Amino acid sequence: MNTLYGMPDNETFAELLALHTGYRRQQLVLHHFPDGETRVQMAAPDLDGDAVIVCTLDRPDAKVLPLMMAAATVRELGAARVGLVAPYLAYMRQDMRFHPGEAISARIFGGWLGHTFDWLVTVEPHLHRYTTLAEIYPHPAQVVHVAAQLAGWIGVHVTRPLIIGPDSESAQWVSVVAKLLGAPSVV
């Protein structure tokens, strides 16, 4: 059987995902020491099954090291494969060197993910100069598209919506949602 863990602030989504997939939900706890280090503690996964870690990667700098330790720990505890469900996938927008000396974080982060996780599920990543995650992540990856669901929710809950995007690169998503709603948009 597959086992599912939720990183802190991802527990509610992990619970819902466990209900819909039938995966066994297990505990993952982080303890923060006064010096800023973090201890990861987790229940053992079902042997020979996938271990799935749910962690949205907004504000990634504080999340990535504990996530790396959780993935390594669950593998050491017997998981056959380790997968990541990341509703938001960080570090994708820096996908080229815009100025001399800048890191191409999309490639670096994709490489780290490839060393750490056997598969990945994410929602509409910031792929501007890459056509697929396969260009930067070497394992199976599933991209979930949510424009129709988002438009459906907005249509039910918002009167006369205006769809707003934070920057020019968000236009690809903003325009689809606005078109589905027949609503104006601004980027």
Where are these regions (language model features)?
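PRPP-associated nucleotide enzymes
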Residues: 1-187
